[in-house]
C-alpha cells in the first residue's frame, strides 16, 4: 500500500489527524520499520516546512535536493529513522534524527564535520568466507570486517561509522557506566549512564536502568543505544 489512514499512522508522526484528508503517505520498505520511521515527504513538508503540500514535497525530493546518509534519495516514501543524517543540498542544512522526550524522534541541526558520522548499534554478527565477520546494524546496514576487528565487537555495542569512507572510526562497548539513550518506548529520549542490568533468558528483554543525576529510569535492553563511554561522542540532543 502507498498510503495509510491518518488515524492509524504512528502516534508520534507530526501530522494533523482530522484535517488534510483521510490518507497519509506510508513509509516504503527499507532500513527502518514503519513504526520507527518517517517518510521523507513528511519530513520535508511537516517537520522542516520546506513544502506546504505533498505535491511540493515530492517535487523537492524528485529533484535530488535531499540526501540521507550522504546518498541522494528520490523516493518520497523513503523511511528515515534513528540516527539518520538528513541533508538539504541547496541550503547546506544538515540534521540528525535523534530520540526526543517530547517528539519521540526529532531532527537536530549538526555541523558539516559530523555529517559523515553516524552511530550504529550492533544487532548481530555472522562468519563469512575468508575468515571474516559480517556485522549487522540497526539501520539494515552490513559491514564485513577482519577477525581482529570483529572479535572485539559484540551485539548491543555501538560503533561510530564513517559514512564517506565506509569504515568504523570508534568502537563503544556495551558495559556498565557507559552513556546511553532510550530509543523506543515510554522513556524514549531519556539519556544517562548505564546503571544496572538485570539479565533474563531473552537477552533483548533484559531490564536496564539509566541514571541521570539522581533520576533513574528503567526500560528493556532492546530499547537503548550506547552513545559514548563517558558522554555522547557526537551531538544527539539540541
From Swiss-Prot:
Domain of life: Archaea
Keywords per UniProt: Ribonucleoprotein, Ribosomal protein, RNA-binding, rRNA-binding
All copies of domain S4 RNA-binding, residue ranges: 38-110
Gene Ontology BP annotations: translation
Entry's Gene Ontology molecular function annotations: rRNA binding; structural constituent of ribosome
CDD domains: KOW_RPS4, S4
One Pfam family named in its UniProt record: RS4NT
Any GO CC annotation of this UniProt entry: cytosolic small ribosomal subunit
NCBIfam families: PRK04313.1 (NF003312)
Family of the protein in this entry: Belongs to the eukaryotic ribosomal protein eS4 family.
Designated name of the protein: Small ribosomal subunit protein eS4
Organism listed in the record: Pyrobaculum islandicum (strain DSM 4184 / JCM 9189 / GEO3)
Organism phylogeny: Archaea, Thermoproteota, Thermoprotei, Thermoproteales, Thermoproteaceae
